[in-house]
Amino acid sequence: MNGLYLTLPIFLPLVGGLVSYLIRFPSTRSRHLFYGVLICLTSAATWLSILRCGSESFQLLRFTEELTLTLRMDGASRLFAGLAATLWPFTMLYAFDYMSHEKHLSMFWSFFTVSFGVTLGVAFAGNMMTMYLFYELLTLATLPLVMQPMSTTARKAGVKYAVYSM
């Protein structure tokens, strides 16, 4: 059961954010409703994981005997995931208004949501390989947020961000 508690908060926003990029929302209200529900569900799933998950590890993938993708809930991951799960919905509410005048909102909201899942992956990382993988994925998931206006200046900033982060 720990596997579900640890993977659902990560994969719900990952899949939801990527699929939502393909959806053409008929109105701003419907877009906000979709992302609001998705992010609040992810926060609820995260808090459920924090409260119900034991300290056992869950192995997602085994490459070799020593190299595995492992998720684990411990004290630090509870703190970090709890902060993310609490603050992300408030950030979303702020961004609804802050980003209202911008273009490329489908890209912004998709990657904003994906970033939530990847952040939780960093929180639940059970070993250094898993943390490194999710850290690099976080760099890639936030790159479109840095480049969001898609202006020449934003693209140059995105290249710098990618070079410094990788």
Task: Locate predicted features.
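Transmembrane helix-loop-helix hairpins at membrane boundaries of multipass inner-membrane proteins
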Residues: 1-8, 15-110
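Short conserved micro-motifs on helix faces and helix-strand junctions that flank
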Residues: 10, 71-72, 124, 133
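Membrane-embedded alpha-helical segments of multi-pass membrane proteins
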Residues: 11-15, 41, 134-141
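Generic detector of intrinsically disordered, low-complexity, polar/charged segments
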Residues: 13-14, 33, 155, 165
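Alpha-helical multi-pass transmembrane bundles of energy-transducing inner-membrane proteins
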Residues: 27, 107-114, 118-166
